[in-house]
């Protein structure tokens, strides 16, 4: 199952992704950055949760300016 990490402030996105059948976890710390296939972040802070120097092979989607539906469509495209 595809695992999606989301920032805690994106609860609407979290719920919509769960409804679509994704395994969704809230990103709480740097250690979780290697546990997901895709991440959704707010983009309000370039140092997301203090992990600006973390690298990941997973897709990172910046949610700024997007609706929950648009974010879900972007997730679906990136995890195919």
UniProtKB/Swiss-Prot annotation:
Pfam families, alphabetized: UPF0180
Residues annotated as signal peptide: none
InterPro entries given in the database record: UPF0180
Family: Belongs to the UPF0180 family.
Entry protein name: UPF0180 protein BPUM_1317
């Amino acid at each position: 199952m595809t695992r999606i990490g989301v920032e805690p402030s994106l609860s609407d996105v979290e719920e919509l992704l769960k409804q679509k059948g994704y395994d969704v976890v809230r990103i709480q710390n740097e250690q979780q950055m290697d546990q997901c296939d895709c991440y959704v972040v707010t983009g309000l802070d370039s140092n997301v949760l203090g992990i600006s120097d973390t690298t990941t092979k997973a897709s990172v989607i910046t949610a700024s300016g997007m609706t929950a539906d648009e974010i879900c469509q972007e997730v679906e495209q990136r995890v195919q």
